Regions:
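C-terminal motif of bacterial Sec signal peptides marking the signal peptidase cleavage site
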Residues: 6-9
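Acidic, metal/ion-coordinating pockets
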Residues: 11-365
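N-terminal export and membrane-targeting signals
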Residues: 1-2
Length: 365
């Protein structure tokens, strides 16, 4: 057992009120220091999924809803995406427009595609009020499909999804740090809602709680600024704080609706935004998307690859790219790393030669 200092007074030279380099106050907490199993596992991540508008018809046949990207989604030991629709037939719309819901067959489509769990930390899960959230969780339970990031109270919303792969325990924490449609959408002790941390300390606490019992901790967060291809200063500050708290992987989605840079931030791996995966309208920035595949060994990401894809203007599905189109997309993705301030290699690694071109996947740089 080790002491991890994240608020005042933990034997720091600064004494009371000392803080980390990011300004996060120190708080003494006890975490399990036992080494993660020296056994490689693979984790897969992709972005936002909406079964609305042009993508609603995809659920007519759930087995084909994710098209040719199914192999990339099903290959990793664990795959997670972001569901942006309430699964409900009831409730009352809360917005004048832009209320999104889908039938329960969405869970069948996700399962058929090889997705293992989804974050529902989007405020769209409350587009039809608390009833929409209750129905979403009930439908997921009936389907036997894991959802996380929202619930009947704050404890349920911040509770990580925990799974095991090859004997390695993985905890995935969902957060939403974007401005919510209504303040009441944030889960509280006596109110249903999404995992919307009031401050950085609450986000850090969620990571620490997960770290107590998991070999690998992933934070899957909605954040950022609309249509931005570079992460905001707020994203960078939060990523650093989460990494300092013990997050091994930090994956973003949500507001950007486009790819942002990915790479190592110290020993943690950060993908600031994976954009849209199955989407109801065209992006004004770029249709680029894809599936991120990470190899984790001993609790640290040792390798990363990316299957580039493009959201179809006809169906809204992400279609994997091949040949020259894939090479060009990978080059664009790698270029986004510069403004993200991330490294193309894990700490201590020797610079590697440029990867050989891949028809549908390869290292993002």
């Amino acid at each position: 057992v080790a002491v991890l200092c994240l608020a005042t007074g933990c034997g720091t030279t600064g004494g009371a009120g000392a803080a980390t380099a990011t300004g996060t106050p120190f708080l003494p907490v006890y975490v399990d220091e036992s080494a993660a199993p020296d056994r490689p596992i693979t984790l897969g991540f992709a972005g936002d999924v909406h079964f609305a508008g042009r993508t609603a018809a995809l659920l007519n046949d759930p087995s084909t809803a994710f098209g040719d990207l199914q192999d990339a989604l099903s290959d990793p030991d664990v795959t997670v995406v972001n569901l942006k629709s309430a699964i409900t037939k009831g409730g009352t719309p809360v917005r004048t427009e832009g209320n999104f819901r889908a039938p329960a067959t969405a869970f069948a489509a996700l399962e058929e595609a090889g997705v293992d769990a989804v974050s529902i930390a989007s405020d769209h899960v409350l587009d039809f009020g608390p009833q929409g959230l209750t129905d979403t969780v009930a439908a997921a339970t009936k389907a036997g499909f894991p959802v996380f990031g929202a619930g009947q109270d704050e404890g349920a919303a911040f509770r990580p999804w925990v799974t095991e792969a090859q004997g390695v325990t993985v905890a995935v924490v969902a957060l939403n740090t974007t401005p919510l449609f209504a303040e009441s959408f944030a889960a509280a002790a006596d109110r249903p809602g999404v995992a919307s941390p009031a401050d950085t300390k609450r986000a850090i606490a969620a990571v620490i709680d997960a770290k107590r019992s998991a070999d690998v901790v992933v934070v899957y967060t909605q954040w950022g600024e609309t249509d931005a291809q570079c992460p905001s200063p707020a994203q960078k500050r939060l990523a650093t704080a989460l990494a300092e708290a013990g997050a091994d992987v930090i994956v973003g989605t949500g507001a950007p609706h486009t790819l942002q840079g990915a790479g190592w931030l110290g020993s943690a791996y950060v993908a600031y935004s994976l954009g849209d995966l199955v989407w109801f309208k065209d992006s004004p920035v770029s249709p680029d998307t894809g599936v991120l595949r990470l190899t984790v060994n001993g609790g640290a990401v040792t390798d990363a690859s990316f299957t580039p894809a493009r959201v179809s203007t006809a169906t809204g599905q992400a279609e994997p790219l091949a040949g020259r189109a894939a090479e060009t997309a990978l080059t664009r993705f790698a270029a986004l790393r510069e403004c993200a301030g991330l490294s193309a290699e894990p700490p201590g690694a020797s610079p590697s030669p440029a990867p050989a071109p891949a028809p549908a996947s390869g290292q993002p740089g």
